Design a protein with these regions (language model features):
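RNase H-like, Mg2+-dependent phosphodiesterase core
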Residues: 1-231
Length: 231
């Protein structure tokens, strides 16, 4: 069962989660969600926000429904993103951390605690912060933030595909959302890269004929960021 709060107190707590960190294509998104401390506030039009869970475990339809619930019922919420060019400039971890701060800056309530999915956190002002491995499977606000980030990113990818139908034909972006599926990898080989591909990621560098970083040259498969199935 998901926990409502990290600590049983009255501090204003925000959950953070990202979407698209492992993608070869496009923006990285971060969602931020603050829920009321009152349990009764987790009901809206007969639907429980307790239905929220890790966005990867939800169907697209369910994510869209819960996205609307979070937008309506959260005490505060925000979505921020880093462009592919910023991911390349900073590296994906630093872009993620920068985007977290960007999302926090967009909130209007005075937050007192941050909980974030993962094992990295960059201190924000004088606010208490906690990085929690698998936090999106434990805390409601983190899972809700992941839903905002995932739906926002998927909608952005859909806009890109609508503007460039050949990107779906060539890379399967309408289905894989930028992750390194077999169809996407073959598209890089057959058609090269688009302006939205992340040039710091190994498969994209291979397609461009650019040298790989040392960890990729050693053949460490885990270093091939973005080579995973889309969810």
């Amino acid at each position: 069962m998901y926990k409502l709060r990290y600590k049983e107190d009255d501090a204003i707590e925000v959950g953070l989660d990202e979407a698209g960190r492992g993608c070869l294509f496009g923006r990285l998104y971060v969602g931020a969600v603050v829920f009321s401390n009152e349990y009764e506030d987790f009901f809206d039009h007969g639907a429980m926000l307790k239905d929220i869970k890790d966005s990867k475990l939800l169907s697209k339809r369910k994510r869209d429904i819960l996205y609307d619930y979070v937008q309506e019922c959260a005490l505060d919420k925000a979505v921020a993103y880093s462009e592919a060019s910023e991911v390349d400039e900073l590296n994906v971890l630093q872009a993620d951390l920068t985007c977290m701060h960007r999302a926090l800056d967009a909130l209007t309530v005075p937050i007192e605690r941050v909980i974030v999915d993962g094992d990295h956190w960059r201190p924000y002002k004088d606010v208490e912060g906690h990085a929690i491995v698998d936090g999106d499977a434990q805390y409601l606000a983190i899972a809700a933030a992941g839903i905002l980030a995932k739906v926002s990113r998927d909608r952005w990818v859909a806009e890109q595909v609508a503007a460039h139908p050949e990107w779906d034909t060539n890379y399967g972006l309408g289905t894989n959302m930028g992750y390194g599926t077999a169809v996407h990898m073959k598209g890089l080989t057959d058609h090269g890269v688009t302006a939205e591909h992340r040039r710091s990621f190994a498969p994209v560098r291979v397609a461009l004929g650019l040298p790989l970083k040392e960890k990729f040259q050693k053949g460490k498969k885990r270093g091939w960021i973005g080579v995973e199935d889309a969810t």
